Amino acid sequence: MKKRKGLLIILDGLGDRPIKEFGGKTPLEYAKTPNMDKLAKLGILGQQDPIKPGQPAGSDTAHLSIFGYDPYKVYRGRGFLEALGVGLDLDEDDLAFRVNFATIENGIITDRRAGRISTEEAHELAKAIQENVKLPVDFIFVGATGHRAVLVLKGMAKGYRVGENDPHEAGKPPHRFTWEDEESKRVAEILEEFVRQAHEVLERHPINEKRRKEGKPVANYLLIRGAGTYPDIPMKFTEQWKVRAGAVIAVSLVKGVARAIGFDVYTPEGATGEYNTDEMAKAKKTVELLKEYDFVFLHFKPTDAAGHDNNPKLKAEMIEKADRMIGYIIEHINLEDVVIAITGDHSTPCEVMNHSGDPVPLLIVGGGVRPDHTESFGERECMRGGLGRIRGHDIVPVMMDLMNRSEKFGA
């Protein structure tokens, strides 16, 4: 029995809702996607719910679920995964947080992403904060991808029951950090002091002085959320399925998830996780890894960002960019030897500007797949696909079965 290889492609935030200016089509339906449409005709379509129907999923919990883990059991907060993703070496008693560089004016958050500052700017600002902020505990503060950063409070894991200061929408003041016990109260007090000192550092930083002169939103505030400790992973993905697994990822959170479950992670030069990401660099690296690994995971972020920015046209353009990436890959592999799944980790409808509980389009193609009669890859066509509506949790088992790598249950 021939064992095939697997390629899981996640177009982050792929799913959407009908857009009036597109004549009622979604960005995926509106975009020109000849390569994914070709695969749709050769494969089988369906929909998947990352967690459960109607439940908006975070990128962290969604990816854990899609890789076959129950997020209700293993998830311990986003922050630790972000920290793993930026390559930090952490101890089990550390407490980590996801941080956004944001813009505050007169006590009101006016931009939760500081005009989507660049990764380079974020890293420079984070360095200044690390060097100038003084706290009663040891801490690590580093830039991640784009407007994102990671904060680690060393030895403070017992204080994980702490709230956040992120209001989750512009036009509101930041929250005060809440707590549930004495340990988390101390963490809340440390975070308040950290944010206060960081604000002072950011206000006078040359990067923000330059952004002010250019009329851009300044990154003068920190929004902190997602307190996390080490995830409770019962068995690595690589151990469970007895495969060598590699991943092509630019975004720190998703890198962290992949590393936590045993993937070797690669970020080719030019892969930024932003709108300017080099999709061909990611495609070429994916083809290269398929020669070496049994299972490859390819993550593409910009589709999600456009949904958060309520920009349907840009989302369609990013989907077309992803389609070119996929086109290169299928030109350089033998589909009979590989099982490919293409989906999103969740839906990010432009009208919502956030994750929603809408089901996500799913396409599976390659050796062993029984094609249905669908013609293109889009939300409505996926509704009539042969896969039906499945749990995100089921995607990898379906792939592994088609790859002839699953084991029989029973005699």
From Swiss-Prot:
List the InterPro entries.
Answer: Alkaline_phosphatase_core_sf, ApgAM_prokaryotes, Metalloenzyme, Pglycerate_mutase_ApgM, Pglycerate_mutase_ApgM_sf
Q: Sorted alphabetically, which keywords does the UniProt record give?
A: Glycolysis, Isomerase
Q: Its catalytic activity?
A: (2R)-2-phosphoglycerate = (2R)-3-phosphoglycerate
- Please name the top-level EC class of this enzyme: isomerase
Which Enzyme Commission number(s) are listed?
Answer: 5.4.2.12
Record GO terms (molecular function): metal ion binding; phosphoglycerate mutase activity
Q: Which Gene3D superfamilies match?
A: Alkaline Phosphatase, subunit A (3.40.720.10), Metalloenzyme domain (3.30.70.2130)
GTP-binding: present as a keyword of the record? no
Tell me which CDD domains the record gives: iPGM_like
Record function comment: Catalyzes the interconversion of 2-phosphoglycerate and 3-phosphoglycerate.
Against HAMAP family, the record matches this protein to:
ApgM_A (MF_01402_A)
Supply the name of the protein. Answer: 2,3-bisphosphoglycerate-independent phosphoglycerate mutase
Q: Can you name the source organism?
A: Thermococcus gammatolerans (strain DSM 15229 / JCM 11827 / EJ3)
Q: Which gene encodes it?
A: apgM
